[in-house]
């Protein structure tokens, strides 16, 4: 059964998502956090929901405030601001989105919660979970596991795509535009994968101390934010994913760096960052993992 669910966040923003219910009543749910330029209507979401519903677990996919390319952030008092979508979002605000989704699912009777992120959604989950843990969030124990699909090293990938000289040039340009009060203006079209505002660009590549924790090319990094996750942890990539290094090498590195005794890590062959044509394979691997939690 599919149900549309609206929910209000701590900062009064209203979001909406799709709750896929299994045939029998359950107290267990996967909350899915999408990545850049995405939404809860993806084919992948429908396939994962079907597979996970078959395991007797509900699946809640919602549009976070970074949904699609550009959108208004609407509040329950009727006001709206053009500061949403991948163009304008501040990834740190995902804390409110994720916390709000957790509390809505608890309100609906789901006491066993699994947080699942894709791409930037992984970044959002790791950041939000660490913040909730730091704040001694009263419902932290209801979070049973974390599922990270296609976690990306945001900074290193950008340097790889642009080259270090152009990377530095674009960062300097963003800082100059900020100094002129042009935070909401767009960066040059060749600075990023899609249109992006100055303020969002600076969040990813300058003001990123709280989200730059997937440092795959830094052999000395201790991955403390990921190691702060003590509950079961599932990580997957597609064989042709958005990573600079070879996946076999990356996975071996992370096996040595991540100290989680219930770590399930690997990649899926013959697919990409979005798991095209392998969504059901991914779903079955997630389902198998959830049975061990």
Outline where the language-model segments fall.
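Catalytic histidine-centered segment of alpha/beta-hydrolase-like enzymes
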Residues: 271-281
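N-terminal cap/lid segment of alpha/beta-hydrolase-fold proteins
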Residues: 1-24
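Primarily recognizes the serine-hydrolase "nucleophile elbow" in alpha/beta-hydrolase
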Residues: 103-175, 206
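Conserved alpha/beta-hydrolase "acid-adjacent" motif
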Residues: 242-249
């Amino acid at each position: 059964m599919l149900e549309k669910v609206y929910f209000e966040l701590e900062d009064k923003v209203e979001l909406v998502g799709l709750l896929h219910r299994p045939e029998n009543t359950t107290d267990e749910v996967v909350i899915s956090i999408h990545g850049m330029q995405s939404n809860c209507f993806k084919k992948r979401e429908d396939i994962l929901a079907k597979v996970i519903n078959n395991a007797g677990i509900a699946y809640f996919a919602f549009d976070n405030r970074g949904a699609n390319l550009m959108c208004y952030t609407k509040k329950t008092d009727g006001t709206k601001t053009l500061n949403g979508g991948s163009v304008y979002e501040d990834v740190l605000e995902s804390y409110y989105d994720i916390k709000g989704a957790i509390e809505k699912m608890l309100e609906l009777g789901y006491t066993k919660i699994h947080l699942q992120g894709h791409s930037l959604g992984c970044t959002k989950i790791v950041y939000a979970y660490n913040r909730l843990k730091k704040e001694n969030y009263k419902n932290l124990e209801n979070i049973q596991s974390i599922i990270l699909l296609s976690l990306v090293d945001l900074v290193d990938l950008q340097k790889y795509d642009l080259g270090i000289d152009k990377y530095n040039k674009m960062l300097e340009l963003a800082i100059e535009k900020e100094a002129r009060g042009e935070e909401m203006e767009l960066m040059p079209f060749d600075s990023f994968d899609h249109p992006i505002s100055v303020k969002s660009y600076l969040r990813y590549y300058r003001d990123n101390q709280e989200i730059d924790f997937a440092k795959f090319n830094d052999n000395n990094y201790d991955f403390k934010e990921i190691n702060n996750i003590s509950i079961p942890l599932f990580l997957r990539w597609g064989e042709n994913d958005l990573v600079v290094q070879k996946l076999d090498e990356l996975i071996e590195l992370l096996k040595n760096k991540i100290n989680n005794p219930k770590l399930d890590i690997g990649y899926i062959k013959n697919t990409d960052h979005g798991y095209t044509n392998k969504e059901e394979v991914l779903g079955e691997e997630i389902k198998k993992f959830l049975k061990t939690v």
